[in-house]
Each structure stands twice: as structure tokens, then as C-alpha cells.
Amino acid sequence: MSKVLIIGCGGVASVAIHKCCQVPEVFTEICIASRTKAKCDKLAAELAPKTTTKITTAQVDADKTEEVIALIKAYQPDLVMNIALPYQDLTIMDACLACGVNYMDTANYEPENTDDPEWRAVYEKRCKEAGFSAYFDYSWQWAYSKKFEEAGLTALLGSGFDPGVTQAYCAYAKKHEFDTIDTIDILDCNGGDHGYAFATNFNPEINLREVSAPGSYWENGHWVEIPAMSIKREYTFDQVGQKDMYLLHHEEIESLAKNIPEAKRIRFFMTFGQSYLDHMRCLEDVGMLSTTPVNFNGQEIVPIQFLKALLPDPASLGPRTKGKTNIGCIFTGKKDGKEKTYYIYNVCDHQECYQEVGSQAISYTTGVPAMCGALMLLTGKWTTKGVHTVEEFDPDPYLEALDQYGLPRSESHNPALVD
């Protein structure tokens, strides 16, 4: 029996909230909080007849730590689920520390304003020292580890699919399939079609910043950075077919390099259609992906935020998206002295997700793991204090929960490898 404060009411949060309400014996009470309370009220009214979970709602500006603290003190939750924006990770972590409450999120911190001088100085130092230039990294949140540990609290970082489930797949492979892991390739394939010439399947601002950044991968103990979208491979995905995929920088590479240090190479690939790439490159060329404010008719606007307002809301894509996703990890390594390969992945159907929770599969594959991560903390399956990523915990109960609540795994012991 637990009380959970869920901050966020977008596409991913909606899925996570639906799934929490399917486990009322654990999620006894939830409070849905967002900047726009009307969205929370609408979702609560939709779910109330379908669950015995007690649902309340609240308004909060998660950019303001004092507002989050006031809400936590008023609601007294056992856990805060941050399913808002990664810009707000640190303010919510500060509030959890101030109130003595466990924390979890689905994506690591990145700043909204990448021109902020204080942040920029730290960022440029990290670029030189670490060797990759993506705006997002774990260092800001890892810096909280001692504070959470001393407070007797747990902060679970990145319990989505990638990051999240992909790291659990790595922990599972290390625990059950390999003595040593040599290489990890994380493959994220979306074979869905929403019918638009251009749209993003999750927050456009976050998505386009991620995809337009230089790619990077971990090899032989250091980062290798490449121009954005410059490494392309083809792969045939189960139940989807052959797709073009591109090497990206992705946050779980950073934590996996730390926690599976014997891995000689770790890469992340994501599929994209040609229409998406053509539109993205055009928008980048004309400055629409910029985070630097510009003056327009006497008013400052951020180009990428203006673009977000013009694009379809990812939460609206559910009814029109058809096809499947396939996300997983391919490993090479050794077991009992012998070379071995292994592939563990999930296939998810967009229309089945929509029929269950009114969402497309991209939000579903992030929202379900968010609920399952919360489940691990609330039921005492994961109890390590401090700030931790998913692969640092026992993967077995987490993957069993994913199997049960909508994201079952598949395996291959003879997969095609990525060159």
C-alpha cells in the first residue's frame, strides 16, 4: 500500500499512470501533478471508473523547487515519479532530498538553456575530459549520490525503455548468459507509420536535440565522437523487417561503460525513415533546431520551442499510428571459455497499445518501464541507497514485471551481428 506523486501528464506519463492503476494493491493512492491541472483532472476522471486506486490531482511548476517541496509536504508520498521534462530532474531531486522521499525518472538531466554561462563552463570542461559533446549526461545527477545515500534514500535514474529496459537486458545478460561481455549493440527500431510527413513520437524538443547531436560510442576505454547521422547500417528486425539505422549518442552508454567495464565496445543505433531525416536536416539548416532565443516582433522566442508548438502532439499520434517497434540489445562475449552471441529484445504493436491505454508504442514502451521501476522500489525489490541506474539492480524481478505488464522479452542465441 503506497502513495505516489507522479509529476507529468504527457504521453509517457499517461501510460505510466494507466499502468499504475492496473496494480492498485501497490499503487493505493496516486497524485497526478502538472503545470496544467486540467490535463490531470481529465485523465483522473477517465481512470476513476476503471480502478480502485485513489486518484487526486494538483498544479505544480516543476521548474520551481519550492513548489515541488510544498506539494510533497502536502501529499506525503512514498515515492516521486518524475515523468516531466529532463530539464526538471534536478529541481525535483532537490525537493525529494528536502522532504526525505525516494525519486525516479525516465531520462537524464539536460538544461533547457544551453547558453547559460554557468552550465556552459561545466559542459565545455566535460566535453574536453570525457570526449563527447551531447548536452545530456549523468554527471549532474550522479553528483547527488552521496546526498541521497546519507539521507537513506534511493534515486532511480532512467527507468524507461532506452534508457532503462536496455540496461536491465545488459544486467540480465551479464548475470545469466555471459562470464564476460565484449560488445553491446543497442538497437531501437520504430516500424510504425503515423501518416504525417514529419512528426516526432515523443517530446519534439527533446527528440530533435538528441538526434541532431553528434553521435558517439564507447570503444576500448574511451569515447569516439562522429558527425551526426554519419554511421548508417541496415538490419532486419523481427516482425518489422529491414530498416536503415544510424549511430547516435545515448545516455545508457555512459552508465554501461561504468558498470560493465570489461565491455570493449558499446554502441546505440536508431532507425529513421528518409522523410524524417530530410525534414530534420532542412529544419537544422534554417536554424529551427536552435535553443538560442531570437527576437521576433519585439518578443524573444526559442526556435525549437516554436517548432514544437507547430508539430503534432506526440500524445495525439496513437489512433493513426500502425506497425511495430523492436528494441533490444545484441551481445558478444564468452561463457565457460567459449565465444557466444545473444540478442534480447521486445516487439510492441502500436495499435495494441492504443487499444489498451490510448497511446502509441513509443510512449507505451517508456511508460510501462516507469511503472515497473516504481514497483521495484515500492515493493522492496530494489533498495540500494544513493543514485543508481537500472543495470545496478537485480534485473530478474524487473524483467518479470515487464513480461507481466505488457513488454514481454524475446531471445535469440544466434542473432545477425551489426558490423
Residue ranges and their predicted role:
Residues 35-39:
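Helix N-cap at the beta1-alpha1 junction of Rossmann-like dinucleotide-binding domains, i.e.
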Residues 175-419:
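C-terminal catalytic/substrate-binding lobe primarily of soluble NAD(P)-dependent oxidoreductases
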Residues 13-14:
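N-terminal Rossmann-fold NAD(P) dinucleotide-binding loop
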Residues 50-64:
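Rossmann-fold cofactor-recognition segment
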Residues 72, 78-81, 103-105:
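N-terminal Rossmann-like NAD(P) cofactor-binding module of classical short-chain dehydrogenase/reductase
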Residues 86-89, 93-202:
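Glycine-/Pro-rich loop/turn segments that contact NAD(P) or position catalytic residues
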Residues 9-10:
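Glycine-rich Rossmann-fold phosphate-binding loop(s) that bind the pyrophosphate
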Residues 61-77, 88:
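Conserved Rossmann-fold cofactor-binding substructure of NAD(P)-dependent oxidoreductases
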